[in-house]
């Protein structure tokens, strides 16, 4: 089993080291199917948020919202090319996708402003899309008012950022040159919108590099946990845009838009996914983007194939993807096992990765 206390301790050490330099730190949990990435990420997220909530409870619940010392651009999506309204309407009429682009690993992510024509919801948000189209869209809000959430439970400093929300939809897979194989191999590297996930990492890395005024703490060498919580509580900013990303439930089979929100309270980003250390196509660039913030910690889960076979077969059964446990094993062996071995074969050779076990 994994040592959650050790992961929490390592996370807090990184936070203490970088809180004066980065608005956000990045924690990455990577491993094969069935390795427990989501379970670990959720438990770590809950522990960190609970610790901060307890600090607020013991210290009157006061938080301060300020500006940043090195402001971000008004719109962090500014460098992204804007797409015409005709293209948006074309996507809308094609299940939200660009059929001719679903396999284009070199697709350049584009953006458009949501004017409410398609859903009646005029919010001024900017949608960023990759080759997966609207179902895998990143939505960036121009509004970042942090003054409303006054309850301590609303101030969550840790947020999970799952790669799974960037599964290409079944409609996308239908438009592959070999749709039968695309569906059979769903979960392999090419069946994710790696273009847009990489774009998400770039946007979040930019927010991580934002610095905040900490002059009142500069004469203090105290880096215990309460001192770190105090710095966070006094240095939230509304100048960081809200970023919404899709989630994924295996039983629903396709992504759910805007399931997660990274807002101004988010100071710890917990990335989890299969291919975050993969050395092929767009995945190979993620490490460089996140490590460029100098506020990164990576855990790679090493686990026996027999263990993940049992777990994934049960997950397939519970999600309704198969009718029996034996069918779940068969599905694992013709797809998930291939992905697991590919991950092991194509993991980036970088030094600052901590191996953990979750058998």
Curated annotation (Swiss-Prot):
<protein>
    <recommendedName>
        <fullName>ATP-dependent kinase YFH7</fullName>
        <ecNumber>2.7.1.-</ecNumber>
    </recommendedName>
</protein>
<keyword id="KW-0547">Nucleotide-binding</keyword>
<keyword id="KW-0067">ATP-binding</keyword>
<dbReference type="GO" id="GO:0016301">
    <property type="term" value="F:kinase activity"/>
</dbReference>
<feature type="binding site">
    <location>
        <begin position="31"/>
        <end position="39"/>
    </location>
    <ligand>
        <name>ATP</name>
    </ligand>
</feature>
<comment type="function">
    <text>ATP-dependent kinase that could be involved in endoplasmic reticulum membrane assembly.</text>
</comment>
<keyword id="KW-0418">Kinase</keyword>
<keyword id="KW-0808">Transferase</keyword>
<comment type="similarity">
    <text>Belongs to the YFH7 family.</text>
</comment>
<dbReference type="GO" id="GO:0005524">
    <property type="term" value="F:ATP binding"/>
</dbReference>
<dbReference type="InterPro" id="IPR027417">
    <property type="entry name" value="P-loop_NTPase"/>
</dbReference>
<dbReference type="GO" id="GO:0016887">
    <property type="term" value="F:ATP hydrolysis activity"/>
</dbReference>
